[in-house]
UniProtKB/Swiss-Prot annotation:
UniProt GO BP: cellular detoxification of fluoride
Reaction equation(s) it catalyzes: fluoride(in) = fluoride(out)
GO cellular component, one term: plasma membrane
Gene name for this UniProt entry: fluC2
Lineage, highest ranks first: Bacteria, Bacillati, Cyanobacteriota, Cyanophyceae, Synechococcales
The protein's name in its UniProt record: Fluoride-specific ion channel FluC 2
Amino acid sequence: MPEAKPGLQLELLELLLVGAGAVPGALLRWQLALYLGDQNLLVNVLGAALLGFLSGLPAAPRRQLLLGIGFCGSVTTFSSWMLAAVKHLSAGDWAAALGLIGLTLGLGLGAAALGFNLGRRLKPPEPPQSPT
């Protein structure tokens, strides 16, 4: 991840990378919703796995901007997930709301951990530190 900058000062390349990842992510999300219906669970779990994988790879700030923040950030959706839970709650279906929240959290955490560990396996081993 790039180092935080004061205020909202951004580099043009950083903006372009995030936008270049966000557009296909949002379009994919839209198409998945059209063809699969409301599949927040599937999309969020797959997005968590991909983001975990990317984060487990050797550091590459530009890749993280493009694919992590841009693509994964726009293909996954926290707000739609919460709205689905609220709809269950407003219908009086507490079990479905809590089940959706618990299932998404559990599967999402597991998917992120799996992706992260897979990404770390591709990372070259660190050279041993010599005692000084």
